[in-house]
């Protein structure tokens, strides 16, 4: 959804660093949501992960693949940059590597504290979960993703804006809880469930 909402028009290059389970889940999603687009996928080389990743998706003709040796090579000229690196205590980029119009999606929120405040807009899926970010008070323009979806705030306004969308995956929890509520409705044969603050663990 972040790509659909914040990527520039006619984007055609997606860069991915960190090629584990999360990256595979993203590729599966892109295979469905971008099925009418031809996309060049750039992968950061690490051990044999990039080659294995290509083999996994090479039958999908909408994707072409390019393996990059450095972070700079990966990011330069990419329209969308996705980081699924699970842990790092180092910065992963320089601001000058991001082209005009680039969208950066740091899935695990790490590695871009040296550049995020230089982007034109920074979107957060939940402020309280991300208020620890080192530059949270320095962003030029920032709001929650929801505010854009509900048209209470501006999204991308032109194809030159560099944008970051920090997502920590709260929607996954929302979907789980909604599913549990539906299950309760079926089990209890009721149309309404009283929602109140939980005092014990209902679902394990």
What annotation goes with each model-predicted range?
Residues 32-58:
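NAD(P)-binding Rossmann-fold cofactor-contacting core
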């Amino acid at each position: 959804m972040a790509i659909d909402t914040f990527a520039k028009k006619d984007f055609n290059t997606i860069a991915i660093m960190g090629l584990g389970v999360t990256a595979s889940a993203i590729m599966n999603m892109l295979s469905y949501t971008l099925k009418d687009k031809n996309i060049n996928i750039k992968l950061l080389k690490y051990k044999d992960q990039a080659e294995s990743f290509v083999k996994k998706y090479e039958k999908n003709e909408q994707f072409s693949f390019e393996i990059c040796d450095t972070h700079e090579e990966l990011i330069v000229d990419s329209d969308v940059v996705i980081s699924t690196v699970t842990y790092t205590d180092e910065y992963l980029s320089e601001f000058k590597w991001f082209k005009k119009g680039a969208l950066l999606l740091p899935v695990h929120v790490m590695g871009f504290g040296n550049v995020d405040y230089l982007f034109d807009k920074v979107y957060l899926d939940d402020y309280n979960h991300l208020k620890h970010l080192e530059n949270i008070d320095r962003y030029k323009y920032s709001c929650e993703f929801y505010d854009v979806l509900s048209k209470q705030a501006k999204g991308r306004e032109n194809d030159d804006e560099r944008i970051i969308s920090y997502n920590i995956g709260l929607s996954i929890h929302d979907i789980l809880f909604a599913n549990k509520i539906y299950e309760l409705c079926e089990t209890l044969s009721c149309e309404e469930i009283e929602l109140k603050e939980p005092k014990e663990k209902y679902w394990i």
